[in-house]
Every structure is written in C-alpha cells, then in structure tokens.
Amino acid sequence: MNKRKILVPLGDKSYEVTLEAGILNNISEELLKIGITKNRKILVISNEEISNLYGEKFLNNLKDNKFQAKMVLIKAGESYKNLKTLSEIYDVAFEFGLDRNSIIIALGGGIVGDVSGFAAATWLRGIEYIQIPTTLLSMVDSSVGGKTGVNHPKGKNLIGAFNQPKAVFIDPETLKSLPKREFSAGMAEVIKYGVIRDKELFKYLEIEKNKNELINLKNEYLIKIINSSIKTKSHIVSQDEHENGVRAILNYGHSFGHVIENLCGYGKFLHGEAISIGMNIAGKIAIEKGLWSKEELERQKILLESYDLPTEIPKINKEDVLTILMGDKKVRDGKMRFILPKEIGAVDIYDDVEDSLFLKFFS
C-alpha cells in the first residue's frame, strides 16, 4: 500500500498530511474519517483550469455523500492574489450561507491555497479549511505550515495570517496534468530541502535513473520526494510555527527570488524559477563569505539546471534590489538576514552580509 501519513505536530493545531495516488476520487470518505460530518457546508475554492480537470467529479463526490458543496473559481496568476479576489470569495461565502460550522477546501496550486487559507482565517473570524494541492510546488511547500495571505502592490504576502489547515490531502496523480514548466518550478523547492536539511534527498535527486523516473512522473518516485520534503518542512514548522527563528531557513533562495519576481514583473518567472535563481545567488554569496566550496555551488547549479530550472541572474537595477530587500519579512531591526549554505544539507541565518557582496551580481 502506497499511502503515507505525515503528522505536523503543533499541539492542539496538529494535523496529518495524507499522501496517496488516487485519493482525490475518495475525498468524501477521507473527510468523514477526520470528523467532517455530512450536511456541513463546504466551499471549494479553485481556478478554471483545475475545475475543468477535476471540478465536476470532485463536487459530485461531495454532494453524493450528502455534503452541501459549492465551488468558487478565482483567476489564475500571482497578479490575482489580492484583496479584490478575497472580497469576491467573501461575496460567494455570504450568498452560500457559510457559517462557523462550514469548511473551505482549497483545490489547486499555491495561489489557491494561500488565498483560501486567508479567506478561512478571516471569514467570521476563522473557520476550518483543508488543503488539496495540485501542483508539485504547493504539495511540498505552501500547503503545509499554515502560511496564508495575499499580495499588496508594495510586495508579496504582506497581508496574511498563520492559519493551520485541518488536514492536507495530496494526490500525485494530479501532477500528470501539470505543464512541464510547472513541474520543474516545483522541483526547485524539493532541491531546496536537499540543500537546507537533507543531503540524502539531494543525492537521490542527482541520480540519473531517479531523475528520469521523476520527469516521467512515476508515482513511486514522486511519493518518495514529496514525503521527504514534507517531513523536513513538518519538523522545522513544529519547532517554530510563526517563523521567529529556525523556520526562516525554509526561505532559502526566497529573498532574492522575490526580488526577481517583483522587478521582472510577476509572470515572467514562475515562483520556483525565481527561487532557483535566488538559490544560485545565495550560493555565490556563501562562496564570497567562505562558507562552502565552489564544488558545492556547482553541484547545486547542475542539479537545478538538470530539472530545467534557470540559474542565470537577470539584468535588474541595483538600487531597486535594495529597496525590495529592505521590505522583506526577514528584515530585523533594519538588518537584512540571509539564509546561506554551509554545505549540502546545512544552512544558517546571517545578518552580516555587506550590500556590496551581493549587489555585484546584479548589473
């Protein structure tokens, strides 16, 4: 049996991530197992692309099992992860009569999950929600850990809340319909876990046979890397739910990744692609500070590129880079903090990086 369960231990906010091929087809059964009783109202938040693939079957499964279910579709893309979209969800929630006993289900990628989680955190001061991620990036990263929110014109995820889901259900079968570029973008986050905490995962990803099986979307191989990634994230989140300390290492590559997304315009690079470039920049800074070797930087670069991820730094204005970085959530007391690698499998947080050390990488 290829069903995996991973506990995210957070006291009274603990929940399980269930990972199984085909679980989407038995969603009502899974909801009943975690205590979601029949006749409860369920608002499913998704987007048009995912709805066309799974929406009708998913809703019918819920309704056939006596759940009161309705679906609301939000527009795909980072530019729609905003307060206007949130307000549209509230309108539907009001019309549907979503009460405190109701539940929201996020069926989609990271944007759907982030917006749904924040809608759940704020509707009637908080109702339960469930994550059902359908992209690799959301499976291994954003669906676990409780970070929810929307963007503001001044920056990504500036409006949000920590809101842990009631459960997460992951079906690797949904990756079969994912565009190849989106799959590669998700691999950036998987490789990130290898660099920050799991050198065995990193080595596994370097093996040619594994690489081919992953690119060909073989469930057994997908389940292994998703399981490893979530275990790492779960362990870190359980130590530091609200990112006051060690959880910041999950942002390896993200500070510069957000700079690139912002300054190149949301949409030019997928999130995972920007993170890949950000990891390359962080790796270069680590060389400058004598933290790790050129060989390790090269291993990281080769691995990223082998999954069709970009590593080349785009041409952007140095002054703009500093402006965006100073608005980063990891800034403490006016000091920028960077996650830098010490070796494959270990990183640390540094607040003593001179501007000149990284600005030279931007033209």
From Swiss-Prot:
Its annotated function is as follows: Catalyzes the conversion of 3-deoxy-D-arabino-heptulosonate 7-phosphate (DAHP) to dehydroquinate (DHQ).
Tell me which residues bind Zn(2+): 189, 254, 271
Q: Give the EC class as a word.
A: lyase
What reaction(s) does this enzyme catalyze? 7-phospho-2-dehydro-3-deoxy-D-arabino-heptonate = 3-dehydroquinate + phosphate
In short, the EC number is: 4.2.3.4
Q: Where does NAD(+) bind?
A: 134-135, 147, 156
Which pathway, per its entry?
A: Metabolic intermediate biosynthesis; chorismate biosynthesis; chorismate from D-erythrose 4-phosphate and phosphoenolpyruvate: step 2/7
Kindly state a single biological-process term from the GO annotations of this entry: aromatic amino acid family biosynthetic process
Record's keyword annotation contains Oxidoreductase: no
What cofactor is needed?
Co(2+); Zn(2+); NAD(+)
Which is an annotated GO molecular function term of this record?
nucleotide binding
Return the cofactor note field: Binds 1 divalent metal cation per subunit. Can use either Co(2+) or Zn(2+).
Name of the protein described by the UniProt record: 3-dehydroquinate synthase
Which Gene3D superfamilies is this protein grouped with? 3.40.50.1970, Dehydroquinate synthase-like - alpha domain
Q: Where is it predominantly found?
A: cytoplasm
Pfam families in the cross-refs: DHQ_synthase (PF01761), DHQS_C (PF24621)
Q: Where in the cell is it found?
A: Cytoplasm
Query: What UniProt keywords apply to this chain's record, in alphabetical order?
Result: Amino-acid biosynthesis, Aromatic amino acid biosynthesis, Cobalt, Cytoplasm, Lyase, Metal-binding, NAD, Nucleotide-binding, Zinc
An example of a Gene Ontology cellular component annotation for this protein is: cytoplasm
Extract the InterPro entries matched here.
Dehydroquinate_synthase, DHQ_synth_AroB, DHQ_synth_fam, DHQS/DOIS_N, DHQS_C
Similarity annotation: Belongs to the sugar phosphate cyclases superfamily. Dehydroquinate synthase family.
